[in-house]
Swiss-Prot record:
It catalyses: 2 reduced [2Fe-2S]-[ferredoxin] + NADP(+) + H(+) = 2 oxidized [2Fe-2S]-[ferredoxin] + NADPH; reduced [flavodoxin] + NADP(+) = oxidized [flavodoxin] + NADPH + 2 H(+). Its EC number is 1.18.1.2, 1.19.1.1. CDD domains: FNR1. This is Flavodoxin/ferredoxin--NADP reductase. One of its GO terms (biological process) is cellular response to oxidative stress. NADP(+) binds at residues 147-148, 177-178, 188, 218-220, 224. PANTHER family: FLAVODOXIN_FERREDOXIN--NADP REDUCTASE, OXIDOREDUCTASE FAD/NAD(P)-BINDING DOMAIN PROTEIN. The lineage of its organism: Bacteria, Pseudomonadati, Pseudomonadota, Gammaproteobacteria, Enterobacterales. It is found in: Cytoplasm.
Amino acid sequence: MNPWINADVLMVKKWTKNLFSLILNAPIEPFFAGQFNKLALYNSNPLNKNKIQRAYSYVNAPSEKNLEIYIVRVLNGQLSNLLYNLHSGDKIFIKKKSFGFFIIDEIPDCEILWMFATGTGIGPYCSILQEGKNINRFNHIILTHAVRYQNELTYLPLMKELRQKYNGKLQIQTITSREKHKNSLNGRIPFLLRNKILEKHVGFSINPQTSHVMLCGNPFMVKDTFLFLKNNRNMEKHLRRKKGHITMENYW
């Protein structure tokens, strides 16, 4: 059984006209960093009231008191627009138990752990790195966040704090695809890998001998990057029953 329970909305942080974070308090069961949950609200149709539900990942570490969920407001998206218009004191539904295996304990030992995210896919990595459990077995972690515009790097201040916390183990790299910015690489992740721009910039190469790659976010990025690594770097999908080099989570 995994019932719906009430979550209290403590705050709605609106970063841009389409990006926002919900700060919630709810008596959910303990979860693992990197997992996701489901949020729901009733639709506004009085003649046919149904719960609209979607899956969203946590940004916060499991040890934190409140939950933080990073969300993109989708054009004509039923739930995301309802969530965007919530206020402190409102209530929403959340599942008692969390879901998913995009967690650090599922990642095999390796020298270099690559964390690739697009958009709100940065959330699970923030949760994992804030929690910090089972991280010492990696010599280097490369956290890469790709967005369209520089102002969409909502959690860059947190990423910089985490870089300081890990004292040389963690490198962060930002990417913008629709504008050029002096502090970010320009392009899309598959393009920057195909041309070895990203690897040259961070000073490490992706290969099956030293690396494990985590992919989270836009399913087109996930698919294209996976196929590039499979076809050009001899890397395979990681499964519980068969050890590989790539762990993936699609965001829609």
